[in-house]
Amino acid sequence: MTYLQESSRPAVTVPKLQAMRDAGEKIAMLTCYDASFSALLDRAGTDVLLIGDSLGNVLQGHTTTLPVSIDDIAYHTACVARAQPRALVVADLPFGTYGTPVDAFANAVKLMRAGAQMVKLEGGEWLADTIRFLVERSVPVCAHLGLTPQSVHAFGGFKVQGKTEAGAAQLLRDARAIEDAGAQLVVLEAVPTLVAAEVTHMLKIPTIGIGAGVDCSGQVLVLHDMLGVFPGKRPRFVKDFMQGQPNIQAAVEAYVSAVKDRSFPGPEHSF
């Protein structure tokens, strides 16, 4: 059995994501952790595969993402990459692996050697020097703003960010700082729709929303959430795309289509 792809679909690259954003084409991202789903999600037209530290929740059974190690992410990145997807492969730098620019680079190298084409890390202004350090060394970077799950204890739980005037202003400063530092993509999680729209309008790089409204350049969901197989409480921003579908590939195709035609997320999935 082989998971290698026989696809004529052009590869999705970092410049391709920028071109999609500039052309107004929505970007569909999903988390992915193994070769089988890498092949399936790629066939269904997913643009970006994220090896997220969410694997700590949906695969390992932890209540937070904090226990996930760099070796965990590297292992699952290699699994995803072996299917040779045409989608862009992005891997999370987990908690405690990017405290300094040097640490961030060393751990990013591990992930890129495993098959990642971009790394994602959580934080705003304070990460600008680290992002710049990575980009100068040919590591493409996706930043993550808003509800950053690695900060769950600092936030006092999983809470919407940017609801106050001060919070929204800080989010805008963070977004500007990470773009100026060279980030090529940014995830906005659990951010009010109007604030996310303002960030998206302000930035030149693509924004990927999760609970951040329909105006972002694209959307991302945790695979297990959108398939309705994770037993925990469903976040407001999740839609079960398996409902009414004959198989998983059809469900993923429905998700990709809904992102592309802006029918997802709806107001009921936003803040």
Curated annotation (Swiss-Prot):
Homodecamer; pentamer of dimers. It comes from Burkholderia cenocepacia (strain HI2424). The active site is at E189. Mg(2+) binds at D53, D92, E122. Pfam families: Pantoate_transf. NCBIfam families: panB, PRK00311.1. It is found in: Cytoplasm. GO terms for biological process: pantothenate biosynthetic process. This is 3-methyl-2-oxobutanoate hydroxymethyltransferase 1. HAMAP family: PanB. GO terms for molecular function: 3-methyl-2-oxobutanoate hydroxymethyltransferase activity; magnesium ion binding. The keyword Cell membrane does not apply. Binds 1 Mg(2+) ion per subunit. Pathway: Cofactor biosynthesis; (R)-pantothenate biosynthesis; (R)-pantoate from 3-methyl-2-oxobutanoate: step 1/2. InterPro entries: Pantoate_hydroxy_MeTrfase (IPR003700), Pyrv/PenolPyrv_kinase-like_dom (IPR015813), Pyrv_kinase-like_dom_sf (IPR040442). Its cofactor is Mg(2+). The keyword Membrane does not apply.
